[in-house]
A protein has these predicted regions:
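Cleavable N-terminal export/targeting peptides
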Residues: 1-24
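Gram-negative (and chloroplast) outer-membrane scaffold detector with strong preference
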Residues: 22-23, 32-38, 59-130, 140, ...
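Surface-exposed strand-loop-strand hairpins of Gram-negative outer-membrane beta-barrel proteins
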Residues: 36-57, 136-141
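Extracellular loop and loop/strand-boundary signature of outer-membrane beta-barrel proteins
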Residues: 44-48, 84-91, 130-136, 175-181
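Predominantly the C-terminal beta-signal and adjacent terminal strand-loop region
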Residues: 80-83, 153-197
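A charged, solvent-exposed segment within the mature domains of Sec-exported extracytoplasmic proteins
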Residues: 115, 125-172
């Protein structure tokens, strides 16, 4: 292979799109998240409880104080879930799960940039409804971890896929009386388009 051709191919490889993150950068991601609670959600009113999954639009904003290390805030439109208490009845609730994470984006020379992160989730429950009576679910604070990968479409945009786990437990009352703790602890699968500014 002629040296000039070799250098040309090398230059093309180096110039391949990559979503590199430098100190001072911002990214915004818009997509969808599937919140899938774990299978066993604990006992409410002494009966086994299951909580269904739900998908909603999501938004992430991330600032990079250092190269490849960002502080990310996850937001979403309200998720809605139905809790089924075996032999007793059902209740529905909406929630917002804002999550603040410290994220390390692993630098690579290609289009794929994996990342891992950890932080704190705050889940606010509201609009609880049930034919059984007045239901109240307490807000939750817990650990959140994440991992995923960005596929660069250009030097300013990427397609992101990620998986999160969140520690979400809520004390539940019915008619003012405590009936137990719902252990939600969901896996959250997300797909989004990320833009760098």
């Amino acid at each position: 292979m002629k040296p000039t051709l070799a250098f040309a191919l090398l230059a093309l490889g180096v110039a391949a799109p990559a979503l590199a993150q430098s100190a001072g950068d911002w990214t915004v991601g818009v997509g969808f998240g599937l919140v899938s609670p774990k299978d066993d959600n604990g006992l409410l009113a002494g009966a086994a409880t299951t909580i269904d999954e739900n998908t909603r639009p999501t938004l992430t904003v991330e600032y990079f104080p250092w190269d490849n290390i960002g502080v990310e805030l996850l937001a979403a439109t309200p998720f809605k879930h139905t809790a089924t208490i075996a032999g007793v009845g059902t209740a529905t609730t909406k929630h917002l799960p804002p999550t603040l994470s410290l994220v390390y984006h692993i630098p690579t020379a290609g289009k794929l940039t994996p990342f891992v992160g950890a932080g704190i989730n705050y889940t606010a429950f509201f609009s609880e409804k049930s034919a059984l009576g007045v239901v109240k679910m307490d807000d939750s604070v817990g650990l959140a971890v994440k991992a995923g990968v960005d596929f660069a479409l250009s030097d300013k945009g990427a397609l992101r896929t990620e998986v999160r786990w969140m520690d979400i437990d809520t004390d539940v009352s019915l008619g003012g009386a405590a009936i137990g703790t719902a252990e939600i602890d969901p896996i959250v699968v997300g797909v989004s388009y990320v833009m760098k500014f």
